[in-house]
Design a protein with these regions (language model features):
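Blade-edge motifs of beta-propeller repeat domains
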Residues: 1-11, 43-61, 79, 92-109, ...
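A short loop-to-beta-strand structural motif that recurs across blades of beta-propeller domains
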Residues: 38-41, 87-90, 138-141, 187-190
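Extracellular beta-propeller repeat domains
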Residues: 2-4, 24, 38, 183, ...
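Beta-propeller blade termini
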Residues: 14-21, 64-73, 112-121, 163-172, ...
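Inter-blade boundary loops/turns of WD-repeat beta-propellers
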Residues: 21, 34, 44-46, 71, ...
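Glycine-aliphatic tripeptides that mark coil-to-beta-strand junctions in extracellular
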Residues: 25-27, 75-77, 123-125, 174-176, ...
Length: 234
């Protein structure tokens, strides 16, 4: 790699996502800052650098994690932010890196990790949310309606206190399944998509004392998804 480029962010940046927020064909950045509870937007300069814009978003109190996707199918990318107190905030994009005011979606536990996928194959993005801490624990799917709103589902049990969530096709059926981590059980949990808007928890398997982050990829080139898991305490 070339020398690093340092860009000024807010206080305690904890999450960064890439997306084309100004629709010029280049990936931009959105950075979630935990301490000052803001999101900063950085436009791609097209020369290996990013320019911090004057756009500052305020999703709400105690943001935890963030993803991007086009939730209302208008060709403009949006943001979804998990909040500590049983909410996911949806910020619909208006173009040119600007967003509408956040709209809350209540979930049944304390949300930690969040992923985006089309779990029912209807060409509308859905959201998977890991729930841990206070309230109920497990994984909850927010089914996309197509206009930026979502329908909640029952909690998928299993996996203890999930802190990480990722999409994975474990059975090669073309549908995204899920894998979550649990520091309480020191394990990873596979959750199979039944292709009818329900999921089945398959099994837990050991993955170190404190599995915190997971990456899914085909590392062996055999057409099957593999996992790489980080453990900060091992």
């Amino acid at each position: 790699f070339k020398s690093q480029i340092i860009m000024k962010a807010g206080e305690d940046p904890i999450c960064v996502v890439t997306s084309d927020f100004n629709n010029n064909g280049y990936l931009d950045l959105a950075v979630l800052n935990y301490r000052d509870q803001t999101i900063n937007i950085y436009f791609n300069s097209r020369f290996g650098n990013f320019k911090k814009t004057g756009i500052t978003l305020r999703p709400g109190k105690i943001p935890i994690n963030m993803v991007s996707g086009d939730f209302n199918r208008d060709g403009i990318n949006d943001l979804a932010v998990t909040m500590r107190y049983h909410k996911v905030m949806i910020l619909l994009g208006k173009g040119k890196g600007r967003f509408k005011n956040p709209v809350p979606i209540k979930v049944k536990g304390q949300p930690t990790a969040i992923v985006v996928g089309d779990y029912d194959k209807n060409k509308i993005l859905d959201i998977g949310v890991a729930l841990a801490g206070s309230g109920k624990t497990g994984v909850q799917i927010l089914w996309g309606v197509g206009d930026g709103t979502f329908e909640s589902s029952n909690i998928i049990k299993g996996g203890g206190q999930p802190l990480t969530l990722a999409n994975i096709d474990v059975d090669n059926d073309g549908y995204d399944d899920l894998v979550s981590s649990s520091n309480a059980l020191h394990s990873m949990t596979l959750i199979r998509n039944n292709r009818n808007k329900t999921f089945t928890t398959l099994k837990d398997f050991a993955s170190g004392s404190f599995p915190k982050f997971v990456v899914v990829a085909d590392f062996t080139g055999d057409g099957r998804a593999d996992l790489a898991v980080s453990n900060p305490t091992d």
